[in-house]
């Protein structure tokens, strides 16, 4: 045994040393990274909180459990052999070994192990502890206990943790004490009775008192947790919760405190019947008040009068949910629909028409991949919609050309290539949302490598070291030249000239990162110099989450080409909680499961070249971000500090807009009776994409809102009634200053049928000429892709636009071949949007493209020539119908009428131009 003891100790010490070194390396490597980023104070705050919380709860467990087990071990040994054991009792063999220093050391190791576990468990709640220390007020009190909402978000989570942690500690200690007394034969079960020594009985009783105290605290917490009840017709406390559950919890709480006192003082009066009676009464009261009584109240008081009883609680739920999701700030405006716009209105809203997004992001990314990846190792992970000021305000789609981890061919996947040479992507691709080439491709205004542009856009530094697909570490400023971009048959190489990454000049730092990344090549490579840097956490989502793990993030970061010629990423960040009182949680969302509070309080900017990250507070009134500013004073900057050229590109985030739309579909109903009956429930409509149906996505568009003078960049979505296809509202979020963040819902008249997206889709499918052409394409071996259907409000009307793409079976490049436009009862499909609009509004071809060529005075919103051209076209169509029916008389009549109109048009143009008259 002695021969084995020394190797075991040495092995244990070696394992412990390796663990400590690994822990140190991990934290030190991260600290260097935080310091390089300028946010070492954030790292220090988080680490210090983790350490202090670990030490505090570690010591509490050591003291509590250690004292009790020490008392049980020594107290039990004094009563050893006082209770006789049966011959087959396993303790007969264990008891002789249960003595001496070895047993004491064994208990010490067990206590130490659980203390480490419980301390680590506590340190995981560092975020809650910091919020507890630096709370902020919401200035909103819930009506049940009169507590500010901040109590539930900043204070209650710590109370919950402390109570659960305390109960775990008591249970673990109780099991340890019970085990010690059992081995020491301080108690025994026989067929006739239960034997236990006085010391063991008193000790176990007092431990039970500690447990009863925890139960009292647990029911105190349960009182406040009623604010998250789901028993009633609406989330939060219901009539039954307030009038039955709360009194029951108070009763159990008081009784638990009484039992705690009785158990604590049991050693002094030793009346077992009192304890047994109290515990029996507690069980009866619990069964009656907590289990049976609430059911009686619900069945016989609430259900027969549910609406009346639940009305005040429904109102509470509506109020707090609307506040938590920012729905109370939505402006409601009527949108009077008469569908009477004319060609003149289309021309007056030409800027809106020119920014209708014909390029659906899903087929467009395939086009980008095929046309602009240039080399097989590049990739476009996503494309995003934004707007730029060129010669005019233009909506564009753009994507960043990144170099993903596995982009280079498998045979070239060497350590040097992966980490030293192929270090970054290069450039962006950009196209206006509605411009198409003659062969159905997007009209690229930024393209190729090195980037070329046909617009006034400064392109200076386009290397992408930090992006959405940059997942592995790279080493820069090494003796190996980095691949910059391809140029013809050759490659251009460069050396990194920025400040991104951690300097890795010393041997110790190389050892640290070799250990951290489990990559010994970092230690032994000969390519590193004193100027070399290691870049990691390069994925922008991971990067911001590492810097600010207490924030939640939008799933759609987007690239921005700055006026300084550099590429940036803008990432929306949210403050969230699942503890806002009375607020309905949302479980199915792209941000965080079960949240019931969200605020887009922070905009994050990431430099794609240097990796610099800046956190700008756009909503300083948010209490959660106020708390984070107190905790991390050096992390956040006021939004006013953001460069103006980046402010021009902030947009309302789609994830938040989707969440708010889902919640508003229910919580626009502020009348409790309407809410109770769910009689005005709204839905996000379906749309057809490719060949299947899916929920419609919100879309960005530049348009002029009702009662405004100028076009602006907005995010919008149409809304339909539940299980209906007609449209009854549309919701938009304004993205441009000074109205950024303003939400408006435009409600449509209930006495009119306004077509929704699926009704328009049905009308499209019913058009023989459209369906036959699409079917023919499909039969010829091409895949027909119907893109996003866009509902476009113009004045007091709607037009509907749907692009149609064609993708051959052999190729992967979708081509935009047709555009469908619907207005009122007319549906037309043409090669371009202008042609489709001309067809829908019966305008002579070419006038949409050249509206300035139309001559004559404006009459009723249309020019004289436009009206006469429309008449001539009508006579021509009637003449052709007569010809097909062999009605020669009517055919001649319609031709004469058409000739008369054309002569009138010619004379009108002659007067305005001074040309000779046509006879």
Curated annotation (Swiss-Prot):
It is found in: Cell membrane. One of its GO terms (cellular component) is plasma membrane. Pfam families: UPF0182 (PF03699). Its main location: membrane. Coiled coil: none annotated. The keyword Cell membrane applies. The chain crosses the membrane at residues 8-28, 51-71, 102-122, 158-178, 207-227, 246-266, 274-294. Keywords: Cell membrane, Membrane, Transmembrane, Transmembrane helix. It is a multi-pass membrane protein. HAMAP family: UPF0182 (MF_01600). Belongs to the UPF0182 family. This is UPF0182 protein SUN_1015. It comes from Sulfurovum sp. (strain NBC37-1). The lineage of its organism: Bacteria, Pseudomonadati, Campylobacterota, Epsilonproteobacteria, Campylobacterales.
């Amino acid at each position: 045994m002695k021969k084995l003891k020394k190797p075991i100790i040495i092995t244990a010490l070696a394992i412990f040393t390796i663990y400590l070194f690994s822990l140190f390396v991990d934290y030190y490597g991260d600290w260097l990274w935080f310091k390089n980023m300028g946010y070492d104070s954030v790292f220090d705050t988080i680490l210090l909180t983790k350490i202090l919380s670990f030490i505090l709860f570690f010591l509490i467990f050591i003291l509590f459990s250690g004292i009790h087990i020490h008392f049980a071990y020594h107290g039990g040994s004094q009563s050893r052999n006082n209770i006789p054991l049966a011959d087959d009792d396993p303790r007969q063999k264990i008891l002789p070994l249960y003595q001496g220093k070895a047993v004491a050391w064994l208990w010490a190791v067990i206590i130490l192990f659980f203390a480490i576990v419980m301390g680590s468990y506590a340190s995981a709640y560092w975020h809650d502890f910091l919020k507890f220390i630096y709370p902020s007020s919401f200035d909103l009190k819930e009506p049940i206990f009169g507590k500010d909402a901040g109590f539930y978000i900043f204070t209650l989570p710590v109370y919950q943790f402390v109570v659960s942690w305390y109960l775990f500690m008591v249970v673990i200690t109780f099991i340890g004490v019970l085990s010690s007394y059992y081995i020491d034969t301080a108690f025994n079960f026989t067929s006739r009775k239960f034997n236990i020594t006085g010391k063991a009985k008193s000790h176990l009783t007092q431990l039970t008192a500690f447990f009863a105290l925890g139960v009292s605290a647990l029911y105190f917490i349960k009182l406040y947790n009623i604010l998250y009840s789901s028993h009633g017709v609406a989330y939060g406390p219901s009539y039954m919760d307030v009038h039955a559950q709360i009194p029951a919890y108070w009763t159990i709480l008081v009784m638990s405190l009484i039992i705690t006192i009785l158990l604590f003082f049991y050693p002094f009066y030793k009346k077992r019947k009192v304890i047994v009676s109290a515990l029996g009464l507690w069980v009866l009261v619990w069964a009656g008040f907590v289990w049976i009584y609430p059911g009686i109240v619900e069945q016989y008081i609430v259900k027969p009068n549910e609406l009346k009883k639940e009305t005040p609680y429904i109102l509470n739920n509506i109020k707090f949910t609307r506040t938590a999701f920012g729905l109370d700030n939505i402006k409601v405006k009527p949108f009077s629909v008469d569908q009477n716009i004319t060609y003149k209105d289309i021309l007056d809203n030409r800027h809106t028409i020119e920014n209708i997004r014909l390029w659906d992001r899903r087929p467009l990314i395939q086009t980008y991949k095929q046309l602009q990846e240039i080399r097989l190792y590049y990739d476009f992970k996503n494309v995003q919609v934004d707007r730029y000021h060129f010669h005019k305000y233009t909506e564009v789609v753009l994507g960043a050309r990144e170099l993903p981890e596995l982009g280079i061919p498998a045979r070239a996947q060497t350590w040097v290539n992966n980490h030293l040479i192929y270090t970054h992507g290069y450039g962006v691709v950009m196209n206006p949302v509605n411009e198409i080439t003659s062969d159905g491709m997007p009209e690229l205004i930024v393209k190729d490598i090195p980037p070329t542009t046909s617009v006034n856009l400064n392109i200076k530094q386009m290397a992408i070291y930090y992006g959405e697909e940059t997942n592995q570490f790279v080493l820069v400023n090494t003796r190996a030249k980095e691949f910059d971009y391809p140029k013809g048959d050759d490659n251009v190489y460069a050396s990194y000239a920025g400040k991104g990454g951690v300097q890795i000049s010393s041997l110790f730092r190389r050892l640290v990162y070799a250990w951290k990344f489990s990559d010994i090549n970092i230690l032994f490579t000969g390519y590193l110099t004193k100027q070399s840097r290691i870049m990691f956490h390069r994925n922008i989502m991971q990067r911001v989450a590492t810097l600010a793990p207490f924030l939640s993030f939008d799933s759609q970061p987007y690239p921005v080409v700055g006026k300084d010629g550099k590429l940036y990423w803008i990432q929306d960040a949210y403050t969230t909680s699942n503890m806002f009182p009375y607020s309905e949680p949302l479980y199915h969302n792209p941000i965080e499961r079960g949240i019931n509070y969200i605020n887009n309080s922070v905009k994050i900017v990431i430099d794609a070249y240097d990796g610099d990250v800046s956190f700008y507070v756009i909503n300083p009134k948010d209490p959660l971000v106020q708390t984070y500013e107190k905790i991390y004073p050096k992390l956040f900057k006021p939004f006013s500090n953001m460069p103006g050229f980046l402010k021009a590109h902030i947009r309302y985030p789609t994830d938040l807009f989707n969440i708010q739309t889902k919640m508003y579909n229910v919580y626009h109903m502020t009348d409790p009776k309407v809410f109770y009956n769910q009689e005005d429930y709204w839905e996000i409509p379906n749309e057809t994409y490719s060949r299947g149906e899916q929920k419609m996505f919100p879309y960005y568009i530049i348009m002029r809102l009702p009662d405004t003078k100028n076009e602006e960049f907005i995010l919008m979505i149409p809304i339909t009634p539940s299980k209906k296809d007609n449209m009854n509202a549309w919701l938009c979020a304004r993205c441009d200053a000074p109205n950024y963040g303003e939400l408006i819902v435009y409600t449509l008249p209930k006495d009119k049928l306004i077509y929704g997206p699926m009704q328009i889709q049905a009308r499209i499918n019913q058009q023989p000429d459209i369906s036959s052409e699409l079917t023919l394409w499909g039969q010829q071996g091409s895949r027909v892709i119907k893109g996003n259907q866009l509902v476009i409000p113009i004045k007091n009307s709607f037009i509907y636009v749907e692009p149609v793409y064609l993708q051959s079976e052999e190729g992967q490049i979708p081509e935009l071949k047709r555009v469908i436009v619907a207005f009122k009862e007319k549906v037309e499909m043409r090669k371009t949007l202008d042609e489709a609009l001309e067809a829908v509004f019966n305008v002579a071809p070419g006038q949409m493209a050249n509206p300035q060529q139309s001559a004559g005075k404006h009459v009723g919103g249309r020019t004289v020539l436009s009206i006469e051209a429309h008449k001539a076209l009508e006579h021509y169509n009637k003449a052709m119908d007569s010809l097909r029916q062999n009605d020669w008389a009517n055919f001649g009549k319609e031709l004469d009428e058409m000739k008369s109109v054309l002569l009138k048009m010619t004379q009108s143009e002659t007067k305005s131009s001074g040309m000779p008259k046509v006879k």
